[in-house]
């Protein structure tokens, strides 16, 4: 499979005991969550109602964390065989998105969540903001796996890699007797968001549904060229809205070696068994194609707007959960 890994971009308590097990038997190798996913699960699934009632009286964020941590622990246990046998099998949980501009609070929350979950195969999701690169470095340095998220620009992907790799180097330096200590080297993914580009820019361009693919290919090339197997490109935001594209479009178009794709359930269902690997375009081919579709200044503005919007959406989802609890 050329070191390609397909993850499930969904989590919900009863799902983990049923459909998720079926997905694991069909080569799903990991899972991701975010505030919007937890909002949908906690506010719409009846399985959480009794749990919430038992936790009444606690602070709303504490209630949320107990629910989320329980689900993450369950997912981590289901994925544990993949983690120990194939060095995959990760589940991601995001820190409070409202901390995105505070390095100290983000780092403290990330370490606290990782400790509370108590599972090696958990990745802590950190948004790729200016305040967060130091957080990524410190987590990797301390042996905590990281999912760097909300990446839209090549600059973001480069800064994420630099921070993650620097932490990885420090971890290895500090753990020379790695095998004797039975300590696993942390892993990281750099989550490049894809379809959001196209949904934003399709109305402005003649060539539809290509900018997200080309932009993701560019970031992938940058990460892959570093030749660090413990830091992989992950393609996120790979769901299709509407009926104008196949549901698995953003999986098939980015089927690159040594990469991860986290996809919604309908995309996974449509994709089953179609391992037709793509050869990534070279950078000069990507820039030629991009420049024919849209200007560099418009792409840069889109990157900035999408990052701001992504953070805002996750903050709103997080606040909605807390208000409902």
From Swiss-Prot:
GO cellular component: cytoplasm
EC number of this enzyme: 2.2.1.2
Gene Ontology MF annotations: transaldolase activity
Reactions it catalyzes: D-sedoheptulose 7-phosphate + D-glyceraldehyde 3-phosphate = D-erythrose 4-phosphate + beta-D-fructose 6-phosphate
Organism domain of life: Bacteria
This protein's record includes keyword Transmembrane helix: no
Main EC class the enzyme belongs to: transferase
Pathway stated in the Swiss-Prot or TrEMBL entry: Carbohydrate degradation; pentose phosphate pathway; D-glyceraldehyde 3-phosphate and beta-D-fructose 6-phosphate from D-ribose 5-phosphate and D-xylulose 5-phosphate (non-oxidative stage): step 2/3
Major localization class: cytoplasm
InterPro entries assigned to the protein according to its UniProt record, in alphabetical order: Aldolase_TIM, TAL/FSA, Transaldolase_2, Transaldolase_AS
Pfam families, per the entry: TAL_FSA
Cellular location(s): Cytoplasm
Active-site residues annotated for this sequence: 125 (schiff-base intermediate with substrate)
UniProt similarity note: Belongs to the transaldolase family. Type 2 subfamily.
Protein's UniProt name: Transaldolase
UniProt source species: Campylobacter jejuni subsp. doylei (strain ATCC BAA-1458 / RM4099 / 269.97)
Gene this protein is translated from: tal
